[in-house]
UniProtKB/Swiss-Prot annotation:
Pfam short name (any one): HK
Biochemical pathway: Cofactor biosynthesis; thiamine diphosphate biosynthesis; 4-methyl-5-(2-phosphoethyl)-thiazole from 5-(2-hydroxyethyl)-4-methylthiazole: step 1/1
Enzyme class: transferase
Organism: Rhodococcus erythropolis (strain PR4 / NBRC 100887)
Gene that encodes it: thiM
Catalyzed reactions: 5-(2-hydroxyethyl)-4-methylthiazole + ATP = 4-methyl-5-(2-phosphooxyethyl)-thiazole + ADP + H(+)
Disulfide bonds: none
Function: Catalyzes the phosphorylation of the hydroxyl group of 4-methyl-5-beta-hydroxyethylthiazole (THZ).
Family listed: Belongs to the Thz kinase family.
Gene3D superfamilies: 3.40.1190.20
Name by which UniProt lists this protein: Hydroxyethylthiazole kinase
The protein's required cofactors: Mg(2+)
Length: 281
């Protein structure tokens, strides 16, 4: 049975997203830029792809949320990542770190660790990336995960010293973070579609959606749960109307657009899970 409180929180968040239409600054990779923008527009937000060193910091200070995605970094964008993260931190703009490929590629792994000093509001990655970022090993295969999302929970908890909330995505998404009362909670979001990893940029675009939800929710934990749930429900609906990856990609955008608070109430599967012994609240 779904956690009723969490479901209602997500239902309220999706209404807030459509009402406020937050503007996300996405410093993302060249593979995902177009699809990420379409995902944000379909869901109810908007996007600006500002990743040059001259404008990135100024824009981060006024955006609703910022995404820093390490998918295809170069010297210029790496500097813009740091500038944007520092500006967001200073201005109080929520920002998301998506540590794509961390663990398997040393240079970007160093960039990701450096970014942690600016305390991302949320970290979103697959299980291998979360484990690697926490310094606990991890088996990263390109941008794909070779670890189960449940196995990343200890690593995600350790990253709460650097971020307000952390998610490890997979067939089931595991999310940890502090609630409005300051207590650490674990939330599991089920659903989704096996076709998601067959379409490029679905994971990277989730990072953008997290940034959008952070702009309209009271805690980073709420924002992560809302974004993951929106994607889980929309992709499940999309699969019902698709015959393969191509038609799924189109159906997914349509479903992100049509999912509303009532859809969340009827289809979301959100559960609390017990944290390992010794977790301090």
């Amino acid at each position: 049975m779904s956690d009723t409180v969490s479901v209602e929180t997500v239902a309220s968040a999706i209404d807030a997203l459509r009402d406020q239409v937050p503007l996300v600054q996405s410093l993302t990779n060249i593979v995902s830029a177009n699809f990420l923008t379409n995902v944000l527009l379909a869901a109810g937000a908007s996007n600006a792809h500002i990743d040059n060193v001259h404008e990135a910091g100024g824009f981060a200070a006024v955006a609703g949320g910022v995404l820093v995605n390490l998918g295809t970094p170069d010297d210029g964008t790496a500097e813009a990542f740091l500038i944007s993260a520092e500006a967001a931190r200073t201005a109080g703009t929520p920002w998301v770190l998506d540590p794509v490929g961390v663990g398997g590629l040393p240079w970007r792994s160093g960039i990701a660790v450096d970014l942690l000093r600016f305390h991302p509001s949320a970290i979103r990655g697959n299980a291998s990336e979360i484990i690697a970022l926490a310094g606990l090993g991890g088996d990263t295969r390109g941008v794909d995960s070779a670890s189960d999302s449940a196995d990343a929970v200890p690593a995600a908890l350790s990253l709460l010293t650097h971020a307000d909330a952390v998610s490890a995505s997979g067939p089931v998404d595991y999310i940890v973070g502090r609630d409005g009362g300051g207590d650490v909670r674990g939330i599991r979001v089920s659903g989704g579609s096996a076709l998601l990893p067959r379409v490029t940029s679905t994971g990277c675009s989730l990072g953008g959606l997290v940034a959008a939800y952070l702009a309209v929710t009271p805690t980073a934990l709420d924002g992560l749960v809302a974004a993951h749930t929106h994607v889980a429900v929309a992709s499940e609906i999309a699969e019902e109307n698709a015959s393969g990856p191509g038609s799924f990609a189109v159906a997914y955008l349509d479903a992100l657009y049509t999912v509303n608070a009532d859809t969340i109430r009827s289809r979301a599967r959100i559960e609390s899970f017990d944290l390992p012994a010794g977790v301090q609240n």
